[in-house]
Amino acid sequence: MKLYEYLVEGTKHFTLIDPDKSVDYLKIAKYALEAGTDGILVGGSLGIRESQITQVVKDIKSIAHVPVVIFPGSISQLTDEADGVLFLSVLNSLDPYYIIGAQIQGAVLLAKHYPKLEVISTAYIIIGDGGAAGFVSMSKPIPYTRPDIVMAYALAANYIGFKAVYLEAGSGAPQPAPPEMVRAARRVFPRILIVGGGIRSGEVAYTIAREKPNVIVTGTLAEEKPEKLGEIIRAIKSA
């Protein structure tokens, strides 16, 4: 099955592993797999080389029975060991480099050196706190209180033709995207909708899952309290 077809069906849980933060990335991956995660995202906003991400993906693939997908923080974070890559465009960045500049460079690299890697074009929309991703990409995060603005961005992403929209509250965010914000994006975007950042409990995961995103991502929780992953995943599956 193609990665796109896998992602667009139902609501899944993905675990984000940032090798720059997690020395014990295999331990986190094992926890996540045992808890029932549906996939692994690998990447981060800072300090990851191509050789590093290649080794991390190879190691995780050796134990994983689910897709392992690159979540790149820069054009150096690519490897053909993965099942696919989220080809991110930060729609609300104030710097054109993060909207289209890096994508031009990355597209050439993908075509020349990673032709077998499945590419999922992804409109990356920073909300709320934004975290490191918002800071590094020089974004103007959308306030939690403005689902109407998120809807406008998601509608634009739909008309442009992105395969996915990713609502990102940021790593370790104080709160996740509120349900009404997820609902607003879902109303106008018919393909893959991803929500991540600030999800720390089964109750919160359940309220988000009820809005029918395709993927709910947890990262900081997996690093700090991996034993809670089971609670999150069960809540998503029960929604």
Swiss-Prot record:
EC number: 2.5.1.41
Keyword Transferase among UniProt keywords: yes
Catalytic activity: sn-glycerol 1-phosphate + (2E,6E,10E)-geranylgeranyl diphosphate = sn-3-O-(geranylgeranyl)glycerol 1-phosphate + diphosphate
Cofactor: Mg(2+)
GO molecular function: magnesium ion binding; phosphoglycerol geranylgeranyltransferase activity
Keywords linked to the UniProt accession: Cytoplasm, Lipid biosynthesis, Lipid metabolism, Magnesium, Metal-binding, Phospholipid biosynthesis, Phospholipid metabolism, Transferase
Domain of life: Archaea
GO biological process, one term: glycerophospholipid biosynthetic process
Biological function: Prenyltransferase that catalyzes the transfer of the geranylgeranyl moiety of geranylgeranyl diphosphate (GGPP) to the C3 hydroxyl of sn-glycerol-1-phosphate (G1P). This reaction is the first ether-bond-formation step in the biosynthesis of archaeal membrane lipids.
HAMAP family: GGGP_HepGP_synthase
Protein name stated in the entry: Geranylgeranylglyceryl phosphate synthase
Higher taxonomy: Archaea, Thermoproteota, Thermoprotei, Thermoproteales, Thermoproteaceae
